[in-house]
Amino acid sequence: MKPSIVAKLEALHERHEEVQALLGDAQTIADQERFRALSREYAQLSDVSRCFTDWQQVQEDIETAQMMLDDPEMREMAQDELRKAKEKSEQLEQQLQVLLLPKDPDDERNAFLEVRAGTGGDEAALFAGDLFRMYSRYAEARRWRVEIMSASEGEHGGYKEIIAKISGDGVYGRLKFESGGHRVQRVPATESQGRIHTSACTVAVMPELPDAELPDINPADLRIDTFRSSGAGGQHVNTTDSAIRITHLPTGIVVECQDERSQHKNKAKALSVLGARIHAAEMAKRQQAEASTRRNLLGSGDRSDRNRTYNFPQGRVTDHRINLTLYRLDEVMEGKLDMLIEPIIQEHQADQLAALSEQE
């Protein structure tokens, strides 16, 4: 491993020990905000520190085994020990490289998930409902909280569009690669000839930003309409104009929210989604401007980004970005998404490592 990388790891290991000491300090414990910030930093440094400690131990093992090579009686055992230690050292170096990759500051944040029915009419709306259920089951398994912000139901079930806020540890980092086009191939219930139809939905995943980081929105750039909410809600529904539609005139972005009974709460929710959408649009523009020849696995949430195809007759799901095909569609639709999410994260990390080695 390069001396510059070892020096960086030593500094991070020292900082980990320093933060550990600070967390035990009475003054730190009294300051809740500082305590939370240091706890987050400690958690982030723990994996690097542990991995680096293991690597240092393996270097000592290599040194010991090399010294034993001079002893004829110990040589065979020493050669075996040396081979194992070198293999372990290589594995740890790879892990450390991944742990040192620049972190996306948004990865630990909550996220807004939008699922929209695209081409395919009723069948697309039904599939949007299936996708939302799939993500909800995944969230449930990870103990995340799902809160529906706004939903427009399809005429025969499912959703024309649904927006939800998903809260928990590392939500955006796990779900961000879901943004893009999702295609379904199956026989609709209304199809008497047994023909397979193809429909599509788009998914967009955006980090929830703290108020301080939300883009400045000029109130003069907003058109706010109120209307009567429709859907569940008992007697209160259709009695007051509590639903909100906000249009951001410069970008044409429209957000509706009718989930709460209070107009004030709906407006606050709609503004937070609007801020996240404007931020996402700005990020996409920046990524396009910086786009090199390297592929970008992070979809824009645009229909043209073809992420996956879900083929029901064959029980097959294919991720087109990394040429991954699994015949485990039933499990995927029940929310077992890690088998699709992990490979794309690993591919993204491999791309980052390749970019770093090119810079060097």
From Swiss-Prot:
Designated name of the protein: Peptide chain release factor 1
Chief place where the protein resides: cytoplasm
Entry's family note: Belongs to the prokaryotic/mitochondrial release factor family.
GO cellular component: cytoplasm
Xref: NCBIfam families: prfA (TIGR00019), PRK00591.1 (NF001859)
Phylogenetic classification of the source organism: Bacteria, Pseudomonadati, Pseudomonadota, Gammaproteobacteria, Enterobacterales
Parts forming coiled coils: none
Family annotation (HAMAP family): Rel_fac_1 (MF_00093)
Positions of modified residues (N5-methylglutamine): Q235
Protein's job: Peptide chain release factor 1 directs the termination of translation in response to the peptide chain termination codons UAG and UAA.
Cited PROSITE patterns: RF_PROK_I (PS00745)
PTM annotation, UniProt: Methylated by PrmC. Methylation increases the termination efficiency of RF1.
GO molecular function annotations of the record: translation release factor activity, codon specific
Pfam family, one: RF-1
UniProt keyword list: Cytoplasm, Methylation, Protein biosynthesis
Keyword Cytoplasm applies: yes
InterPro entries to which the protein is assigned, alphabetical: PCRF, Pep_chain_release_fac_I, Pep_chain_release_fac_I_sf, Prokaryotic/Mito_RF, RF-1
PANTHER family found in the cross-reference section: LD18447P
Compartments where found: Cytoplasm
Region (Disordered): 285-313
